[in-house]
Amino acid sequence: MNETINREDLYLFQTGKARQAYLTFGCHYQKKTKTHRFTVWAPNAKSVSVVGDFNFWNPLAHPMKGDKDGIYTIEIEGLKKGDLYKYHVEGYDGICRYKSDPFAFYAECRPDTASKVWDFDDFKWSDKRFINQRKKRQTLDQPMSIYELHLGTWRMPQEEEREFYNYREIADMLIPYLGEMGYTHVELMPITEYPYDLSWGYQVTGYYGVTSRYGTPEDFNYMINELHKAGISVILDWVPAHFPRDEHGLAMFDGTHIYDHEDPRKGSQPDWGTLLFNYGKPEVQSFLISSAMFFADVYHIDGIRIDAVSAMLYLDFGKQEGEYVPNEDGTNINYEAVDFLRNLNEALRTTHEGFLTIAEESTAYPKVTSDVDDPEGLGFVYKWNMGYMHDTLYYMELDPLYRKDNHGAIIFSMDYAYSENYILPYSHDEVVHGKGSMINKMYGAYDEKFASLRTLYGFTMAHPGKKLLFMGGEFAQFVEWRDKEQLDWFLIDQYEMHDSFHKYVAKLNEIYKSEPALYELDQDPAGFEWCLQRDADHSVVAFIRKNKKGRGRKQQQILCVCNFTPMEWDKYKVPLPKKSKLTKILDSSELDFGGDGDVSESKVSTKRVKVCLLYTSPSPRDTERSR
């Protein structure tokens, strides 16, 4: 960390150009003077001091010196790792507040809120080769199957005196599981420090600290390092849209709205009861961009998924008429947020080659994944395809009798599949708040639900776009995700259908990763060809996926056939490539997957909803196949 503060570092912070503000601000050990230096931005404060265990929380003991720009600093002797501290801020409004350090690397576990003096030990990373290969491994033509995870409830200790597993314990259980299931990436719901469990981490008070619920920064280092050693990339949920009003956090930090807006029509998010960042302030941009960079620089994270991008882009998001202020041209676009997102993506992607930035953006805002070289591009690598998720779940919830009248829901996604670089998400948001679990969303009785979910997952795995599934969905947990209880792992051990479904998802991942036709041309229309698109009466679709052509490399083609009804169609015609010799790769009706066993090497036959994947070869022609 920086031994001294120089004017250039402060200039970068004040102009929105800082990318490593964490080296200047916060608490840092100074080897030369054997002191700890504290630095904080509080431009409108009347006074700031450091208080903690070491001075009996006395605001008069260690007053900080402020400059003309409101940057306060002090060096204190005799501190040790783990000492508790806060800033005592006498605000512009005359109110004295005890504030956590916005740049703290570690903090007390809730409900306590003090920051901790924390000097990073020399953790011995062993993932250099993995990091060096990131650019090649995370290109658009590589497979990506993401397991979305909430660390606190994936597995929980059975001992009453323990609330959570440690980062290290989680790593030792999670890594073999991800390997067994064939996932390429894991996405962690927010682990930046937060006070309220039921926010799931989406109301952040510590943008530079991993939550102490699961251990120390060194424990988190261990988890990331071990995941990398196992070949698994790590994506973090990161929340730069809004922050909570908690007294110890960023709100009214110096008695004024330095991180948000003074006008509540600009600075308040009524749906969530939170405050919106003011991206027009260069210091706020420096603070947030440096936070994302910190996790890439220090913790070796491979990507971030940015939550609630729509709430950033639209001034009227979640608001009624009169509750927001239009921009200067009278529209609802937040141009300051657009500027911030472009700066963020450019900083991360140029500094860390192959780094993933993923937008959870629920509207049709254009060019989310266009490069920042495009004046209108936001610069993300991927965008969640929320439309695909909504349409496919709506379709699968229908009685099969009515699916023919809603056939567009299952095919519409291909009309815009190449407008952005998409991830197809079945995330935590879809299995909470009474929405039902993935298996319970499916129409029908017990066996039909499983047949339908196998079909949906198979269809999704073959559909253009990268993949994401929230924990529990891989073994068809019947209850919704419960944010205070672990997953129902007993289902795999005690119920054959759940065990078989679990194996089916692992098989899908295995096939997906081993077949370039299923991922290489996700962003290229040349990699997809409809065979059957509009047969609404039978609720059948069929399409071919293709890999890249290359010198000395034969193009592979994979046929996907989906029957979305429990009907058996006799001598059903599917247009297939000329002189096709079909070899079945997967049939969701196989007994091993919980199906009825109605399978054949020479036929695609079924009495249930199902999906089949088959090898074929080029040049289309109508060929009669029995169904």
Enumerate the predicted regions with their spans.
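Conserved small/polar residues in nucleotide/adenosyl-binding loops
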Residues: 615-622
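C-terminal accessory region downstream of the catalytic core in glycan-modifying enzymes
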Residues: 487, 493, 501-502, 508-510, ...
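Short proline/glycine-enriched turn/loop motifs at strand-loop junctions of beta-rich domains
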Residues: 41-47
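Conserved alpha/beta catalytic core and glycan-binding cleft of carbohydrate-active enzymes
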Residues: 300-302, 317-485, 492, 513-516, ...
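The feature marks proteins involved in alpha-glucan
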Residues: 1-37, 65-148, 153-162, 169, ...
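Glycine-rich phosphate/pyrophosphate-binding loop
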Residues: 109-151, 407-453, 460, 602-603, ...
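Substrate-binding/active-site clefts of carbohydrate-active enzymes
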Residues: 108, 128-141, 150-332
